[in-house]
Design a protein with these regions (language model features):
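Short, structured secondary-structure elements
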Residues: 1-2, 6-185
Length: 185
């Protein structure tokens, strides 16, 4: 149970305690304890944040830090609170568009701000912004549709579910987003 829920093996002491317990409900008690642990949310949030391409920095050579920890913490809290998946989705894709959104619902839209961001000298701001939109489209497609959309960026393919035209319709939806970070030359 420990490996499945928290992604780490139980300690020797925990194994000994489990084996020494005579109650038939011991397994259920252990699972309930693990599910109520903050580490449960951390473990499953890590899986989600990998899909959302979360990072604490921009990468590239400049590798500037990002203030995206609030989004990471929101995902952990959502996992620990067992937020229903439909609400989890709505708040990340459009939390700021809900009627009277709470600060947490606005933070959830940090999903859109985890795209690649190159702020090195010489990078054209509009090219950077468009690359962020492409990344947002591709990540949203992979995360919620379970489909890689990158091929449709260049061409339609008879085996892919998304045509090039549909890809750019999706792109148009996200293409009203301002540049995340200005270039610092």
């Amino acid at each position: 149970s420990e490996m499945c829920i928290r992604d780490r093996p139980p300690s020797v002491e925990q194994i000994d305690d489990f084996l020494a317990e005579d109650s038939p409900e011991v397994r259920e008690q252990v699972v309930d304890h693990l599910l109520n642990s903050p580490r449960y949310g951390e473990h499953w949030a890590r899986q989600w944040l990998d899909l959302a391409r979360y990072a604490d920095s921009n990468g590239f050579q400049a590798d500037q830090l990002r203030d995206s920890w609030a989004y990471r913490d929101w995902v952990i809290e959502a996992m620990n609170a067992d937020l229903p998946f439909d609400q989890f989705t709505i708040e990340q894709l459009a939390g700021d568009l809900l009627p009277e959104p709470s600060p947490d619902q606005r933070i959830a839209t940090g999903f859109h701000r985890t795209s690649t961001c190159n702020v090195e000298a010489g990078v054209h701001p509009e090219e950077n912004r468009v690359n962020q939109v492409f990344d947002r489209v591709n990540t949203t497609g992979l995360t919620w549709l379970g489909a890689t959309l990158e091929c449709a960026q260049c061409h339609s393919h008879k085996y892919d579910p998304i045509s090039q035209e549909e890809y750019y319709q999706f792109f148009a939806f996200f293409n009203n987003t301002p540049l995340e970070v200005e270039n610092k030359s």
